[in-house]
Amino acid sequence: MTSFVLASASPARLAVLRSAGVEPVVRVSGVDEDALIAALGADAAPEHVVTELARAKAKDVLPVLARDGISDAVIVGCDSMLLIDGALQGKPGTVDVARERWSSMAGRSATLLTGHSVLRITEGAVVGDAHDHSATVVHFASPPDADLEAYLATGEPLQVAGAFTLDSLGGWFVDRIEGDPSSVIGIGLPLVRRLLADVGVGVAELWATSGRGD
């Protein structure tokens, strides 16, 4: 059976895959995102940035899989960033930065871009490479100051792209979205399905043995 390797430490991405019948092998990439973004240049299109980050993450775990003896697998790498006012925003990292971002996006709309990369390896060699991005418009509410401060205090928005989540506490402050919900969470199932097809893999081949596939 082909292994499904998730090149991410994201609990949200893992949860999406598990709910969709896939039990991934998790191998976290060590890509220096800031260095790669700098290398791409200030004029790089936002869609190109997130896609190249996803590709780098998928490729980065190849030596780890070789070390671990995983020679037949599909590797999925993802990267999400929020595009607002023409600028890409990743993880805020601190309460002050998250607060500043919420002050600029409350009551407004922004686009969550998620780059996706799928590599297929057979007998240790890359035999398939597909990549693309998804774009979902997110319409934000204007949370009262007390609610926003309470949200910031949880720490949840500090380590997620755009300083919000859709599937957890941050969902209270999202009025609606236009696009794929799973992409906003971090891994778009419709896009991953298409990329898997591009490298010759059907999703049912990857379902965990639970009555849904074998």
UniProtKB/Swiss-Prot annotation:
Localization per record: Cytoplasm
GO BP: nucleotide metabolic process
Cofactor: a divalent metal cation
Disulfide bond annotation, renumbered to this chain: none
InterPro entries: ITPase-like_fam (IPR029001), Maf-like (IPR003697)
Keyword Hydrolase: yes
GO molecular function term, any single one: nucleoside triphosphate diphosphatase activity
GO cellular component terms, A-Z: cytoplasm
First-listed, main subcellular location of the protein, grouped into a coarse class: cytoplasm
Keywords: Cytoplasm, Hydrolase, Nucleotide metabolism
Reaction catalysis annotation: a ribonucleoside 5'-triphosphate + H2O = a ribonucleoside 5'-phosphate + diphosphate + H(+); a 2'-deoxyribonucleoside 5'-triphosphate + H2O = a 2'-deoxyribonucleoside 5'-phosphate + diphosphate + H(+)
Catalytic residues in the record: D79
Enzyme Commission designation: 3.6.1.9
Group of enzyme by EC: hydrolase
Family indicated by similarity: Belongs to the Maf family.
Function: Nucleoside triphosphate pyrophosphatase. May have a dual role in cell division arrest and in preventing the incorporation of modified nucleotides into cellular nucleic acids.
Name of this chain's protein: Nucleoside triphosphate pyrophosphatase
Species per Swiss-Prot/TrEMBL record: Rhodococcus opacus (strain B4)
